[in-house]
């Protein structure tokens, strides 16, 4: 397939959600042949089929319309500002990786550099110049731009597809590729509403300056609202609308062939299956916010390589998770579960209900039927929440980053500042797949090509350390490791793994003592992949693994929540964890046993990258704040330094060894608690119906500097406000609520504490409500604070056995 563009080609792999910075050309095209930066045999990986190639093109480039979300809806509906220029300005291209963890697009250039078609920043409005911009820049402030996705050449429908044999797929134009911003995973589109005259006026007469647009504007004297910038000013339109492909979080450096200079990678140094271990997407999403706002503190504290996937569809659970690598998916375990979902069919009953069967108008036999069946599904996400099928999980990623937001899901989200339970936005409601399919063409454009995307994802393979070191085979690596860790260390480690680890971290069946964990499949269709996924993907109670439990308490897939339709009935039927104080019903309270394939390349460890050294971008990284605390929870005066990003083979291996040491010696870990670096105050003005007079409780919740970030991210402030009102108008109801939850003695005490707080606040308008320990226990979705505890399996091994296990795992 060929997507035509002016100069160059994009060539990468994929991860869990990824994309690339330029458009894609098939091997053998004239443009690829004339492009010196691209090996003509390299296109996302070697030997892809046409279907896999199309899947890669889509997954790398498609934004599916979310540029509109990130330009308008995100700011106006969620009240959170992104300063795209701060993140993407071309004059800071050399700092982009270290500061934001973004990977520079090899095909883009800084205006004014030798051989760059753009000679000045004013030509590109301060951004990099990228392939396709010669056309795109002509449409800034104008309509009529033809998206490069329109040139996508689909492969034929699979034989037997219920929607075949005629091709009735949604137009590929609705995939919306745009062009690269210069950072892989972020795409730009010309803004037809851009007003050049206004832009020059607000930015001092300079097209390449965004200073006036992003600078704080002093509020009117008669208002107490904090100063905000024109980022939220709908009357000023930027030159570009910025979109995000799923790969924004997952394209990164290939462990087998890392770049000599991470600021200047080549295409052959990049992979799409690894996950971006350096990306600071939480900080990017809050880049236009002041540090003392609740929004920034909710968004801005994830480690590099981790992101809270429910930050936008917020469930008030601070639950950052890593951007996973997708490896050997063909051997990932499947589970039979009870699934309600839409399935392809070619007809619906006459006069039927479109809520259970719907045919796309004008498309003969392109229908979908909603039914309940037993299906074999993967457990996807950290707690296995995405559990109705791989295709649906792939598509949900697009919605989670803004596709079909206005048509489909923004009105199902929580408004963090809406305190009236009778108003829209107070809580969540479920995303409706059938309704969004009907109303959003971008949904259909992605859905009609999910089979190709999945085929591409199935190409991901392990990154073997012996290959990364340029050795002949794994035996040569074992020889090296035995020299480093001791004679026979690898074989001894295999025995330790078989007896202590494989019951969770192997997809083969017990007994494990004689199993070969590197056995390659002999089935031709498997293309030489290993039979062992090195994880069983079963769900285990979080109290058993005892790692930070916040991610396991993620609630968006529960009944009545935004992603309800993406969770299986079997998931929601699982019992809660009786060992937890927090609510854990409805499918919450579990982690899955993950894969250990290529573990040497993916340190630090655990779902939040917290076990092992802290990593950072070095001196330009203004987002790093030490999380290390003493036994009393106070910041260490002299914490261990962070390890500067090092994607080299030896850099990864050193980080792996240090992380294994931390993993196997939990008593030696210095506790990590990410704290606020700025005081945060949440203003609350709930209305109180008090007899004939309606009053407002004028108060604020204060979170001082050093407050664990999890406290605010997990704090149910809306329920607190409701209880303050209930304490005034129906104290008996409030008492019954907490007696039922905690028992008579404790429940009555909690109700009395809440009543006293409400009385105090009414007596002293404008006073500060401190979130003390008694309130935190009642209103926290997760009480977990320490981020690097748990997973104590293996701490009783001898030092020799720990070294041996470290050596063996490096061979997998």
For each feature predicted by the language model, list its residue ranges:
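Hydrophobic helical h-region of N-terminal Sec-dependent signal peptides
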Residues: 12-19
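Periplasmic c-type cytochrome electron-transfer domains
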Residues: 2, 7, 21-812
